[in-house]
């Protein structure tokens, strides 16, 4: 067994001690491999809003723990960074940006019908309103659940989808596969930089809200 897999299994074991770990498993067990191009595009749209709340949660964590060097190092890998650059029509060589900005630009690569876009934007905006009503500490410690195996498992599930044709989905897949790489590094991975925040079930509503927007965008994931 690889070091990366051992680390992922350990993180999964820790998360399953809490109810939010079951929600992560539920998300991973959705029918990702059957999702078509339209469904994947919808997921990319609502994931953009998740990436906004992730960035905000990291900013909250940094404000609560301004002297935490590990969180500072994590921050350097998520905000104002060139670690997703270059990517055609999204990021120039060496260009620094927040990761949610990469996703925002990604959505511009393929036009969707106006009514469909309004529906997806409404799902995302409602989600952000819900998340922003939650307490700051829960939002801060959620970072550890995302970075220390949670999102890596979700991303590995998403990339089992078969149809990634088109510039938007190619950019989204680049985002996902690079984040798998960032999070799985056994020594300097993003999970190693924040697991000391020790999440518990105070973050359960955040994971439930994430699952809800994925299913809202692509209800066929559950059928």
Where are these regions (language model features)?
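Active-site-proximal alpha-helical scaffolds that flank and shape metal-associated catalytic sites
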Residues: 4-14, 70-175, 222
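Extended, basic/helix-rich recognition subdomains
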Residues: 147, 183-184
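Terminal targeting/low-complexity segments that flank the catalytic cores of oxidoreductases
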Residues: 1-69, 131-138, 146-154, 160-170, ...
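A short structural micro-motif
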Residues: 49-50, 77-81, 126, 182, ...
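A structural feature that tracks compact, well-ordered secondary-structure segments
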Residues: 72, 174-181, 188-192
């Amino acid at each position: 067994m690889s070091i990366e897999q051992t680390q992922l299994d350990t993180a999964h074991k820790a998360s399953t001690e809490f109810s939010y770990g079951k929600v992560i498993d539920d998300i991973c067990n959705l029918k990702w491999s059957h999702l078509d191009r339209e469904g994947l595009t919808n997921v990319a749209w609502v994931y953009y809003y998740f990436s906004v709340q992730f960035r905000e949660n990291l900013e909250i964590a940094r404000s609560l723990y301004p002297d935490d060097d590990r969180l500072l190092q994590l921050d350097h890998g998520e905000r104002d960074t060139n670690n997703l650059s270059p990517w055609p029509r999204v990021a120039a060589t060496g260009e620094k940006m927040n990761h949610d900005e990469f996703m925002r630009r990604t959505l511009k690569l393929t036009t969707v019908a106006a009514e469909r876009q309004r529906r997806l934007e409404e799902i995302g905006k409602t989600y952000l309103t819900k998340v922003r009503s939650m307490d700051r500490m829960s939002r801060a410690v959620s970072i550890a659940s995302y970075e220390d195996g949670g999102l890596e498992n979700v991303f590995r599930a998403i990339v089992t989808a078969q149809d990634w044709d088109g510039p938007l989905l190619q950019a989204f897949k680049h985002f996902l596969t690079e984040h798998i790489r960032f999070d799985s590094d056994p020594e300097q991975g993003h999970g190693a930089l924040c697991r000391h925040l020790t999440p518990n079930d105070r973050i359960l509503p955040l994971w439930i809200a994430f699952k809800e927007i994925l299913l809202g965008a692509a209800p066929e994931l559950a059928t």
